[in-house]
Amino acid sequence: MGKNIITVEPFHETAHKDSTHTVETFHETALPHDETSLQLVAEEGASLSSGSLRLYALPYGCIDLYNYDPVNRRAAIGIMVATEYRRQGYGLAMLKALENLYVEPFNETALHTLYADIAAPNTASLALFRKAGYTQCGHFKEWLEYDSHFVDTIRMQKIL
């Protein structure tokens, strides 16, 4: 079952009357917990222009953007889906929400390319990125230490 993305915006305390909200309390009070919605939130003041950004899709997981290159409009992406929500469409919904956030034509941090470096043994992550339309653009031999030994890394890329 596909997930319907509702709002995709940073979380700012000033947008809420109760200034005691944090990412955690926002999850408890404002994020719907049904099977058809997902929202990405960032900590107040967080911005990709600083070079990296973590977006939360509570309670499902989070997405990191890092190695932001404003000249070439690209960033690396990493995703973590909580164990109990894996293989239910939340990872794909999180990727799509992120892409929607950074392809807006008048967004000063609009991206042209997203890429992910994935440990070759992580077949679930490779399958997720393929399903989201990413294609393999690189293969690095023994690039990453994973479970106490070095493994190959596959670079996946998507032109937005």
Model region roles, listed by residue range:
Residues V8-H16, V23-P32, T36:
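Long, intrinsically disordered low-complexity tandem-repeat segments
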Residues A57-G61, A124, F150:
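Glycine-rich acetyl-CoA-binding "A-motif" of GNAT/NAT acetyltransferases
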Residues R74, P105-I118:
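Conserved GNAT acetyl-CoA-binding A-motif
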Residues R87-E104, L126-K131:
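Conserved acetyl-CoA-binding loop-helix of GNAT-fold acetyltransferases
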Residues Y115-I118, T135-D152:
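Conserved catalytic-core motifs of GNAT/GCN5-like acyltransferases
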Residues F129, Y134, M156:
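Conserved active-site tyrosine of GNAT-family acetyltransferases
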